[in-house]
C-alpha cells in the first residue's frame, strides 16, 4: 500500500510540474504577443454573483471560472460568496493546475490544459 501511495504521489508531482511549465509558457507567450491581462473576477458557489479580486491575468475558459494570473499561478475562480466578499472582494488562492480540466466531472467533458491555453492564445490573434 505504501508503494502505491508513493507512486501516486510521484505521478501527481510530475503532472503538477508539467502543468506548471505549461502555465509559465502561456504567460511568457501572452506577454510576447501583447495580450493584455485583465482584472479577474470570481463567481460565488452555485454560480451566484460575481466578486472583484485583486488578481490580474487571463481567463482560460469561456465560463471565466479558471484563470492564470500575471505571476503564472493557476486559479479556480469559484469562491464562497457573502457580504464580506461583496464589500471587500474575494481572495481566490492559487492551486496546482491540472493537466486535464474537468477530468472526473459529472458531465463527462474534459479538456487538456494545453488545449485551453492554446485556445486562449488563439483569441489574441
Give residue spans per PLM region.
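Generic structural hydrophobic/aromatic packing signal, biased to beta-strands
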Residues: 26, 30, 74, 99-101, ...
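Intrinsically disordered, low-complexity regulatory segments enriched in Ser/Thr/Pro
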Residues: 68-94
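Amphipathic, interaction-prone secondary-structure segments
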Residues: 42-78
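Generic preference for flexible, low-structure residues
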Residues: 42, 46, 76, 82, ...
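N-terminal domain-onset segments
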Residues: 1-52
Amino acid at each position: 500500500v505504501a508503494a502505491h501511495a508513493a507512486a501516486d504521489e510521484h505521478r501527481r508531482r510530475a503532472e503538477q510540474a508539467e502543468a506548471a511549465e505549461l502555465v509559465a509558457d502561456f504567460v511568457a507567450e501572452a506577454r510576447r504577443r501583447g495580450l493584455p491581462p485583465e482584472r479577474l473576477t470570481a463567481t460565488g458557489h452555485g454560480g451566484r454573483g460575481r466578486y472583484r479580486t485583486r488578481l490580474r491575468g487571463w481567463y482560460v475558459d469561456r465560463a471565466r471560472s479558471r484563470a492564470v494570473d500575471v505571476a503564472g499561478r493557476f486559479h479556480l475562480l469559484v469562491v464562497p460568496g457573502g457580504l464580506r466578499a461583496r464589500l471587500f472582494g474575494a481572495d481566490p488562492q492559487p492551486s496546482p493546475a491540472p493537466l486535464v480540466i474537468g477530468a472526473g466531472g459529472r458531465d463527462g467533458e474534459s479538456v487538456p490544459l494545453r488545449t485551453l491555453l492554446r485556445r486562449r492564445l488563439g483569441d489574441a490573434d
